[in-house]
Each structure stands twice: as C-alpha cells, then as structure tokens.
C-alpha cells in the first residue's frame, strides 16, 4: 500500500501507510514476546502476498479499513475468550493493543470518509495527502 501511494507521488498517504506497517510489526513483536514470556513457542506460517493492485484510492482505503475492522474483531474475540477463561494477564496485555487498534480503525474510517467525499477530485485528494503528511 505504501508503494502504491509512493508510485503515485502521494507522499502523505505513503507515509501514513509506512507508519501503520511499522506499528503492525511492533504489535506482532509484542505478541511474540508475550507468548515467549508465557512459555509458548512462536510458529510463523507462510503469509500469502498481499493485494497489490487497486482501481482507485477509495478502493485501497476501503480495503484497508476492512482489514482494520477485521483485526479489531479478532482482537475482541481473543479478549472475550481470555475473559471467559479468567486469563486476566492476557486481558491486561490486550487492553492497550485493543485501544490502539480501535483508534487505528477510527482513523481509517475518517480517511475513508474524506476520500469518498473527495470523489476522486485531484485537488481534494492532494489536500487529504497534505493533511496526512503533517501527522
């Protein structure tokens, strides 16, 4: 996603997606560290290549928003399971991750709303790009 925007000289969008990807790597590391601290092994399976082509900025942002929403749902399911089995330690671990994930989902919803409102008008897209560059 970063590359898709970078190739189109939309540096604000590109920067936002680069930052998001680094955040996701940090979360993955936290999960691995947590599992290791609990005496578990971390098994990394092959990850299929991500989607790399979209018809429009709106399609890409919509795809990203749906990924964020799915991740939020998965984290909430994990939390529910740990709550049901009285695994307080896992709940405490998940609390800040779920908070950050919810904020990320909200941010993508906001960006998606702006992109939809812009209706592929180049000047409006450039304003959104500029706004993202400032963050």
Positions of PLM-derived features:
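Iron-associated oxidoreductase/ferritin-like identity signal
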Residues: 1-135
């Amino acid at each position: 996603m970063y590359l898709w925007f970078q190739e189109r000289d939309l540096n604000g969008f590109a920067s936002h997606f680069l930052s998001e990807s680094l955040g996701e790597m940090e979360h993955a590391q936290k999960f691995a560290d947590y599992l290791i601290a609990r005496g578990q092994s971390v098994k990394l399976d092959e990850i299929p290549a991500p989607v790399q082509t979209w018809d429009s900025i709106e399609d890409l942002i919509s795809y990203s928003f749906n990924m964020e929403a799915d991740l939020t749902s998965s984290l909430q399911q994990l939390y529910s399971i740990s709550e049901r089995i009285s695994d307080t330690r896992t709940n405490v671990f998940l609390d800040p991750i779920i908070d950050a994930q919810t904020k990320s989902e909200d941010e993508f919803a906001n960006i998606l709303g702006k992109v939809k409102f812009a209706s592929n008008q180049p000047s409006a897209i450039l304003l959104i790009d500029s706004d993202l560059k400032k963050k």
